[in-house]
Amino acid sequence: MELVVQFQVLNQSCQCLAWKPHPATAWGTESQHVVAGYSDGTMRVFSISRTEMELKMQPHAAALTAIAYSTDGEMILSGGRDGLVAVSSPRTGMTIRVLADHKGFPITVLQCTRKQYHDFGVEGGELWLATSSDQRVSVWASDWLKDKCELLAWLSFPAPAGPKGFGSLPPSLATFCPWDPDTLVYVGFGVQKEALFYNLRKKQVVEKISLPYFATSISLSPAAHFMAVGFDEQLLRLLHCPDGAAQDYAGHDDTVHLCRFAPSGRHLLTASHSAVLVWELTGS
């Protein structure tokens, strides 16, 4: 691995990053744009091929905590420490919508996925979710070109009274399930240490998988029914779904604060303090 380009913004901390999705006609080529969210509420779009910043926007007054491209790459969704979610166009540099449903609680996750246009009885070719640190998840259907954005589900997962301050609690995390597009998976501070599978059609939790600790990171394989979960206890667990068969892995010297499956599902990336580990799945 070698460093090919570096972008630096003086006096600001980069809080979140997202690659622009591949155009449907150019699958197999590497996306050449990334968007970065910063501690001053700005976000910047960088061109890798031209090694330059193409756009700077400030849709937030508070630090950005989560960022994602829409599935077609035409919009950028950003979430702030104040709980606001902004939708901005990288073509025009304008913020077209601000959603305040999670106001007051930092946004921890933003994720977009495709859907059939009239699926779930609402118009829009995209589903997206926002998760905030108060154990709440909102799911939306959108068609940004028609200025459509409709709330599909508002989920609140029960949790006991915890210590004051979100930084002392395990993060609230949610992700769409790659092998079941009607389902999302949630982990976070709660009554039990578990991963919850919530079905958007049935409007209920359809599966629970017990965990040894509260999760600090999660990723689902797009290629097989595997879920990777990281913990504060320097542990990585690989789970087969739905039976919950588990395999634990050591090798981290701190909290496993990030885990991401590669699109092929054959490799898993994990991060712990200053170390980045790459795992290869064999026999799966």
List each model region and its residues:
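Short coil/turn linkers that define WD40 beta-propeller blade boundaries
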Residues: 1-2, 51-52, 93, 145-147, ...
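Conserved loop/turn motif of beta-propeller repeat scaffolds
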Residues: 23, 30-31, 73, 116, ...
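WD40-repeat beta-propellers
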Residues: 1, 43-47, 85-90, 137-142, ...
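Canonical WD40 repeat/beta-propeller blade segments in eukaryotic WD-repeat proteins
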Residues: 11-26, 62-69, 104-121, 161-177, ...
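Hydrophobic beta-strand positions that form the internal "hydrophobic ladder"
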Residues: 34, 76, 128-129, 184, ...
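Conserved strand-to-loop turn within each blade of WD40 beta-propeller repeats
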Residues: 37-40, 79-82, 131-134, 187-191, ...
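Short C-terminal beta-strands that terminate individual repeats in beta-propeller domains
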Residues: 3-9, 53-59, 95-102, 150-157, ...
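Blade-level signature of beta-propeller repeat domains, shared across WD40, Kelch, NHL, RCC1
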Residues: 257-284
